């Protein structure tokens, strides 16, 4: 049976001399794996649409196991992302996270839209670091590890949080901060941003500019939380960290 779906290529693996197996996150079917025969040949009609990060309309035959991609049409190639090592590294991490945290053929139109908007904004030159933090926070629920971001995880107070506890999995108010001596001390702004990143609609994102120290705090907390609860150890994240430590930056800000 033949099917048609909008999808973003989140992983590719060479198969034989001329074929590819592509993992596509689709709006209609969730994550699917497709054999793209001949896609490695330069003149193949499947070459362009099976490039990593490409957003396209995919026509495929669904089999018992691996499906077969028969035709594709590019909707958006995200050229600016693919031509910039730094931004491409952020998108690699975002797509890697999507791949690792989702099951095959589990439809999730919300997640598809989140993935698309994240890559789209990066392609438009918006801060990839901030976009990645937003994506990570929104993926807490998909990973099944959402922390308490609406009240104190200990006493349920809605007072302004003064700490984030990895151990307790959420915010701590000033009365409960001593319950975890290892809790991160946070400002009201950091607490507000973590809550905002989780709840707001990414399509409504305007211009957002954060101080380097604020971004560093958010990254540390979010990554420590993932390390503690997700069980993931992604090469794409390590590579991105290495680029940052070597002084690489987003060329769109030059």
From Swiss-Prot:
Residues passing through the membrane, by range: none
GO term, biological process aspect, one: DNA recombination
Annotated InterPro entries: ARFGAP/RecO, DNA_rep/recomb_RecO_N, NA-bd_OB-fold, RecO, RecO_C
Keywords: DNA damage, DNA recombination, DNA repair
Annotated Gene Ontology cellular component terms: bacterial nucleoid
Highest rank taxon of the organism: Bacteria
Entries under NCBIfam families matching the protein: reco
Family: Belongs to the RecO family.
Function field: Involved in DNA repair and RecF pathway recombination.
UniProt xrefs under PANTHER family: DNA REPAIR PROTEIN RECO
HAMAP family, sorted: RecO (MF_00201)
Annotated protein name in UniProt: DNA repair protein RecO
